[in-house]
């Protein structure tokens, strides 16, 4: 019984059972380990929720029908800056009213960033900071 336990733990007389490795088995061993180290990596690139190619479109509308192109850009999830220098105040109000509805429909925001300049952003944009200057409210 003691011999069995010694053999089980590798302490006993096991010289007779040991075989010298042959050259063929030694040559085969490195190729197996080489193939194991060449396994393909399991790396998966992570895709972010926000697009890296975000764009901001600039518009200076001259007539009311220009609002259609501005709204199309917003529906494509692009931010828009609108400069109302080239339209009268009544036309600018109509365009801002239309864009307010468009921005509401896409869960975006519209912000006044200058006397006659507005920023419209879709839902996936965030604006930080604020303007400290007082705007002339009689213009729009």
Curated annotation (Swiss-Prot):
It holds the Pfam family SepF. One of its GO terms (biological process) is FtsZ-dependent cytokinesis. InterPro entries: Cell_div_SepF, Cell_div_SepF/SepF-rel, SepF-like_sf. One of its GO terms (cellular component) is cytoplasm. Residues 15-47 are annotated as: Disordered. It is found in: Cytoplasm. The keyword Signal does not apply. Keywords: Cell cycle, Cell division, Cytoplasm, Septation. Belongs to the SepF family. PANTHER family: CELL DIVISION PROTEIN SEPF. Homodimer. Interacts with FtsZ. Cell division protein that is part of the divisome complex and is recruited early to the Z-ring. Probably stimulates Z-ring formation, perhaps through the cross-linking of FtsZ protofilaments. Its function overlaps with FtsA. This is Cell division protein SepF. It comes from Lactiplantibacillus plantarum (strain ATCC BAA-793 / NCIMB 8826 / WCFS1) (Lactobacillus plantarum). The gene is sepF.
């Amino acid at each position: 019984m003691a011999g069995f336990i010694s053999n089980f733990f590798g302490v006993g007389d096991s010289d007779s059972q040991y075989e010298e490795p042959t050259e063929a088995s030694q040559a085969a061993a490195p190729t197996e380990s080489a193939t194991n180290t060449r396994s393909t990596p399991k790396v998966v690139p992570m895709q972010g929720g926000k697009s890296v190619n975000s764009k901001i479109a600039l518009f200076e509308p001259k007539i009311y029908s220009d609002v259609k192109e501005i709204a199309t850009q917003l529906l494509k999830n692009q931010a828009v800056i609108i400069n109302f220098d080239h339209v009268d105040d009544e036309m600018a109000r109509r365009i801002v009213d239309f864009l307010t509805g468009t921005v509401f429909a896409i869960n975006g925001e519209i912000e006044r960033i200058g006397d006659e300049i507005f920023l419209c952003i879709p839902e996936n944009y965030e604006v930080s900071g604020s303007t400290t200057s007082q705007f002339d409210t009689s213009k729009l």
